[in-house]
Each structure stands twice: as C-alpha cells, then as structure tokens.
A protein has these predicted regions:
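Active-site metal-binding core of divalent-cation-utilizing nuclease and nuclease-like domains
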Residues: 29-62, 208-231
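Short, aromatic/basic amphipathic alpha-helical patches
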Residues: 27, 121-129, 260-264
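Conserved catalytic cores of phosphodiester-cleaving nucleases, focusing on short active-site segments
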Residues: 9, 56-58, 65-73, 85
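Active-site-adjacent loop/helix micro-motif of nuclease/hydrolase catalytic cores
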Residues: 75-84, 258-262
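Polyanion-binding interface signature
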Residues: 170-264
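Short, flexible loop/turn elements at secondary-structure junctions
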Residues: 60-62, 72-75, 89, 114-117, ...
Length: 264
C-alpha cells in the first residue's frame, strides 16, 4: 500500500541521521535523486508523514528547506494534490513552522514518487522531480543484503516491475488487453505515438477508466467547441472489451441535453 511505501521511503531517508551506519549512503543517494545535489557531511533531517495530508514532508535541518513527497503505488495524482499541499506549506503558523524546524520564506521542492506504471496523467503532474519505480530500484539495489527490511521491499518492487513489464508485452499474451490498462495504454501508444501529443492538450492524450471491472482506454483525436454555445463535440478512439475480446471503436460525442427537444 501507499502508506507502507511511505514508511519505506522514510526508513531509507532517516539513515542520514546515523552517519556511522552502512545504510547512510543510501539516504544520501535517495536525497540526491530528490534534487539535493550536494549533501554535506553532518546534514540531518526530519521526516513527517501525513502532515496536513501530505504523504511525506522532509525537513532539512538548518537549511530552511523542505521536500514535499507525493507518493503513489498504482493510482495517479488527483485534484491537483501537489499544488494544494504546496500552497498549504506557505500558510503555516509560527508553531507549525517551529515543529518542522523551518522559518518564513521556506524553500520548497516537490517530488512525485510513483513505483507503478506512468500513464499520461502522471506525466502532467506539476512536480519539480519525478521518481519512478525503476529509479528507486536502481537506488536501492547496491544495498541489497544489508537489511532484511530493505531486502523484503526490494523483492516486492522487483516483482511489481516485472509484472508491469509482462503487461506491456501483450503480444506474447494478447488476452492481457482484456484486463490490463497498462497493456491497453501500450497498444494505444503504438498506434498513436506520444510525439502527436502536446502536453496540456486533450488531443492524443491517453485516458483510462473502468466499467464493471473491465478497463477501457480512450484518446480524443478531434474536438470542436461552438463559439457562441457551451457545447461542442469530440471524436475519439475507445479501446474496450466484451465477450469476444478487445476491440477498438471510433466514437462521436456531443454533450447535448437529451431531454431538451430543441437541442435534439
């Protein structure tokens, strides 16, 4: 779960406070991945979980700098979480700042930490740094064998990434398209490469959802909004499945009021 992964991340970082430990370099490596280019000898930190719903808040002692981590396993950011948490950090009371060991005008860095598959929605997240499952695995692997906790999490992460790789390789098992959003995303991007997508535009962005437990995937290829009206139309591809397997359909959507005779 994400709360368990929060605990692992904090566990890794807290070794910075024990410079004699053989896992001290792990904390340094992870901080560098989070954007701390220089980690000085003697630097310490404080990690706080669920601080005003922020997954992890890392307070760097004596730096007046904090790192805000939004941690995900398989879900994606929703409701502009990072933006809201960033704004909340600028509104702390004097007592709250004291508890975090920071002052006014604190320097804030945001990290989007996701070990699951990165969908298009994840690529739009407004964070200073993004850390993927592959990047975290690369950071942890050199320290394998130095802790049972670390080894257990490494086994979990390796299996998770292997499963994602299998789902992407749907050509070996085409039936994965029926029940895997990762497989559907991969096929949609094979047909419509990411180079067609301009970040921030709905056109050629891959969307995902589910219906009765089955994943579906959509991509808008044309959109028109009438200048003098609130409505318009969209043309999009939809990948879905039924009893016969996975299919791709071209659809037209007009958001008119079906109960209004004039709009019909």
């Amino acid at each position: 779960s994400e709360l368990s992964q929060d605990a692992v991340i904090c566990w890794c970082l807290n070794w910075l406070n024990e410079p004699a430990s053989n896992l001290y370099p792990l904390a340094v490596d992870l901080l560098r991945k989070m954007g701390e280019v220089t980690v000085e000898s003697g630097q310490t930190l404080q990690t706080i979980q669920q601080f005003y719903k922020t997954d992890i808040l890392i307070c760097l002692t004596g730096k007046n700098r904090v790192i805000l981590v939004e941690d995900k396993t398989d879900s994606s950011e929703h409701g502009e979480q990072i933006r809201r948490y960033r704004e909340r950090m600028t509104q702390l009371s004097e007592e709250e700042r004291r508890l975090c060991g920071i002052h006014e005008n604190v320097e804030l860095r945001t990290v989007y930490f996701k070990t699951g598959f990165l969908y298009d929605a994840d690529r739009l997240v407004d964070a200073d740094v993004t850390i993927t499952g592959e990047a975290f695995l690369q950071c942890l692997t050199p320290y394998q064998g130095k802790s049972e906790i670390l080894d257990a999490y490494l086994t979990f992460l390796e299996r998770k990434l292997e499963q994602q790789a299998r789902e992407k390789d749907f050509l070996q098992e085409p039936e994965r398209l029926n029940n895997s959003a990762i497989a559907q995303h991969t096929l949609m991007r094979m047909i419509f490469p990411e180079t067609l997508w301009k970040r921030g535009s709905v056109l050629y962005e891959v969307y995902h959802g589910s219906s009765f437990g089955r994943p579906w995937t959509e991509m808008v290829i044309a959109e028109y909004l009438f200048p003098t009206q609130k409505d318009g139309y969209r043309i999009f591809w939809r990948m879905d499945s039924d009893q016969d397997g996975t299919y791709l359909s071209l659809r037209f959507y007009d958001p008119y009021n079906k109960k209004d005779a004039a709009e019909k």
